Amino acid sequence: MYALLLGGLSTAYAQTGITPEVLKTLQGSYTGTPAEKAMRNAISNVGISKMAVNQENAGAKDKNFSIEVKNTGITDQKSSGRCWLFTGLNVLRGRAMKKLDTKNLVLSQCHLFFYDQLEKSNLFLQGVIDTRKQPIDSEMVRWLFQHPLSDGGTYTGVADLATKYGVIPADIMPETYVSNSTSEFCGHLKRKLREFGITLREKSEAGMGEKQLQALKVEQLGTVYRMLVMAYGVPPTRFTWKGKTYTPQEFFKAYCINEGEDLNRDYVMLMNDPSRPYNKVYEIDYDRHVYDGHNWLYVNLPIEELEEIAIASLKDSCQMYFSCDVGKFLDRNVGFADINNYDYGSLLGTTFGMNKKQRIETFDSGSTHAMTLMAVDLDDAGKARKWKVENSWGADSGQNGYIIMTDEWFREYMFRVVVNRRYCPASVLELMKQKPVRLPAWDPMFQNEE
């Protein structure tokens, strides 16, 4: 019976595999015309993107903006995935610079990243404890061990971490070699966390109770803390800066937020995700940095409404945390994002016709990078023509560290923007009262900005 089954499968595979006859048909799709040979030679020697540059769109770019928030200076995340942290701190430092009346201030990314990695380690280990009764091949447990932690993140991480641990100037806890190049150390930390996770599951299976597991977790976190100190340094509990002594929390409350302000409560994450119904609130499980913090919660809006809210914020000189699929159709040399920058279809003799909804559903596009939205250029009707963001790839990238994007590109590849509630119309604030639709951690929209 087994042999018959295998025989049946082999026949089915033979009918659907690439047979010699099918291969011969496929080979006929390339005829080797002089034009095809020339194109093949050019692509193989120069590369796709250089060959696909659309010369009809390669002229001078308009760099003028009708509304632009004063910049705070370009930072550089180097070889790390911390764009979310640089972006969030860039927004906060703009406020601090105004209150301190200074043009020279950078907030320490290394300080908050230390606690980010510590909190994410606890998030993973506690997740292992919470799911210890589930089989190790269950979807949730498998996801946990696949994603023990990363250096990427979202706005909620900035909000939770800054609120809990405060912020400090960068010269108090400067960058290290490891913070500028996180991949190797993160790999070692992930391996150690997986080892700790397996130990927790084995101890649970052997009869260890909740209280003892929590004690073991704290012991494991002690090892994590020591590893983090070796890589990033010791976070100060008090520091002296320009003649005054602060705790990180005191500095944060004094200069980065207004009295009574809450970075979670007072801000709304807006999303344009056409793969899901609009005017609903969504929450992604485990999309947070702190176990007792906030999941990523967003209201899904049509792009037209989202743009109106973003414009209102910029008109009031308020920058925003913004994220997008930055790599699509971006000319990195000039810092210009335009869907007409490259003509890949003509080059390769085909078309690329998926819309935004289809790209999300098939994992072809998603939010990959966070930047600070700081400018918009409006036409006579008050509609956006182009946008400008402050990036964190250093001053030598793009337009002296900035990226300009056409509104057409913005609509196709922009995903998230975080705005103060005061810029949202009453209809959007009413939507936020809904019970969120809970999405699993492995949803296509679970993607950290890096």
Give the ranges of each region predicted by the language model.
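Active-site signature of cysteine proteases
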Residues: G17, G207-E450
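Papain-like cysteine protease catalytic cores
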Residues: Q109-F239
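N-terminal regions that are enriched for targeting/export leaders
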Residues: T16-G73
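Structural recognition of the beta-strand scaffold that forms the well-ordered cores
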Residues: L85, H111-F114, D160, P169-I172, ...
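Post-signal peptide N-terminal segment of secreted/secretory-pathway proteins
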Residues: G59-D62, S66-T131
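Stable alpha-helical elements in mature extracytoplasmic
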Residues: S79, T87-G88, L92, T154-T163, ...
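Bacterial Sec-dependent N-terminal signal peptides
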Residues: M1-G17
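Second-shell loop/turn segments in exported
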Residues: V69-G81, W143-L149, D292-N300, I309-A310, ...
